[in-house]
């Protein structure tokens, strides 16, 4: 079975380490980046299957980065992982081209299911987020 290739983007080193540990049994983390501008370069260079993006980052936030990536023709599927659990952020993330949205407080339970669903072409939003 081929492991999905993931580009992991978060400006917090501690979160990067936790996220990578959660992913590595099932997915290949091809590299990490610390801001939205760096992900533009790394995505073009590495062509990952999935981009895991934080929203609040320096230089260029995740939503702006996702819009630019999609406009440039990037084929990677995008999942946002963020502390922002309100509907406005979820809707902005999905409108920017993401298929997935995971709140960081639920990474341990939601991250791998989100990647599996998105890799299969389906959407995923952390069940703890009310979309009513």
Give, region by region, the residue ranges found by the protein language model.
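Two-component/phosphorelay signaling modules centered on CheY-like receiver
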Residues: 13-31
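Acidic, metal-coordinating helix/loop segments flanking the phosphotransfer/catalytic sites
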Residues: 32-50
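Acidic catalytic/metal-coordinating carboxylates
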Residues: 35-38, 60-64
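Short amphipathic alpha-helix used as the core "switch/output" element in two-component signaling
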Residues: 41, 63-74
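Receiver (REC) domain active-site loop signature in two-component systems and cognate sites
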Residues: 57
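Short, conserved "switch-loop" micro-motifs in signal-transduction and mechanochemical regulators
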Residues: 84-85
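Short, flexible helix-to-coil linker/hinge segments that flank and couple to helix-turn-helix
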Residues: 88-95, 99-132
């Amino acid at each position: 079975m081929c492991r999905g290739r993931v580009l992991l983007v978060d400006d917090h080193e501690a979160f990067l380490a936790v996220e990578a540990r959660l992913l590595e049994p099932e997915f290949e983390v091809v590299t990490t980046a610390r801001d939205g501008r760096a992900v533009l370069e790394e995505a073009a260079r590495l062509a990952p299957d999935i981009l895991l993006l934080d929203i609040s980052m320096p230089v260029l936030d995740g939503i702006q980065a996702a819009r630019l990536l999609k406009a440039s023709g990037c084929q990677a599927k995008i999942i946002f992982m963020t502390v922002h659990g309100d509907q406005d952020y979820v809707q902005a993330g999905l409108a920017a081209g993401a298929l997935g949205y995971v709140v960081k407080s639920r990474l341990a339970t939601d991250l791998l299911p989100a990647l599996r669903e998105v890799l299969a072409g389906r959407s995923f939003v952390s069940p703890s987020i009310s979309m009513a």
